[in-house]
Amino acid sequence: MKLGVVGLPNVGKSTLFNAITKAGAQAANYPFCTIEPNEGVVAVADHRLDVLNEMYHPKSLVPAVIKFVDIAGLVRGAYKGEGLGNKFLAHIREVDAIVHVVRCFEDMNIVHVDGSVDPVRDMDTINLELIYADLEAIDRRIDKAKKNSKSGEKKYLAEIDFLERIKAHLDDMKPVRSMDMTDDEKKAAEELFLLTTKPVIYVANISEDEIGSEPEAVKKLYEQAAKEGAEAMTVCAKVEEELSELSDEEKAAFIEELGIGESGLDKLVRASYSLLGLISFLTAGTDEVRAWTITKGTKAPGAAGKIHTDFERGFIRAEVVPYETLVREGSLNACKDKGLVRSEGKDYVVQDGDIIVFRFNV
């Protein structure tokens, strides 16, 4: 699973990416300083691992991770291939969700491509490019379905009807993700690989002076996100980049001084994890304490397969204890003695925070 970090040139996108990954993606006051997407893997902050680390003192501690991709800045006409449009759209097709960084700060030293700060206009600029690209794709699919429908098969007529509904929604300049669809239709829409089916988090990038306040530009961004049914959050990318260079102790002191309670990046990573419908199950022992990423609704054999394909192929059962129960009782053996470890079969749906030992035979 990976998220694409997008935004118009000079909105602070690469600065934010630097902070989340500490990968040093070039951040300069120049459009298209990011030409090839930079990728970074980020740990998902999880206090449960810290507690289990103190309990087990394992040889290794492995957090869940999420991948971010810094995608080159976009300009109007991208869907027609202008600027780096073709590359931009190709890279967006490869990600599972979008982190859309929107400039909400004023800075005379950093030129805005449109000459002024207007978050709603900037949101629309990128969204319209994605909608136009989807319209072209849908038109091609409709033409193909109409040719196939000449065979008289009813499935093609149903497909045309569905595609026409999507086209009408896009013609209204609305993303496909905001359509009312049944679960089956949502699945069918995902199989079309349209750009506007991808979930979005809008990130309002503010200046350090605006931390703790609610600038008018941010209010407008939140209002627009609410209309789209999208998530939104506020960060100061420059401060987050500074925080990423500090030790844990220095970071905690700086966060306290800023009065923000928690870094914006921790919030972003957690929100991204949630947006993708991801949860973590845990394995714990003296060799390793680890968080494993799965999608909500994954059954026990599928979760076992995340560890090794043999675990899934030869799955017998899962021995499960909730994290809170293990911590309360102090050890897995204590949980077993009290009959608190459940034996679950192949139909068990794994829950966030389950601590699991898989039994298998191949």
Task: Give a label for each model feature.
Residues 23-31, 38-40, 48-51, 80, ...:
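Glycine-rich, flexible loop/turn motifs
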Residues 2-6, 11, 17, 144-349, ...:
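C-terminal-of-GTPase-core extension/linker across diverse P-loop GTPases
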Residues 32, 46-49, 62-68, 82-96, ...:
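Amphipathic alpha-helical transducer elements in NTP-driven molecular machines
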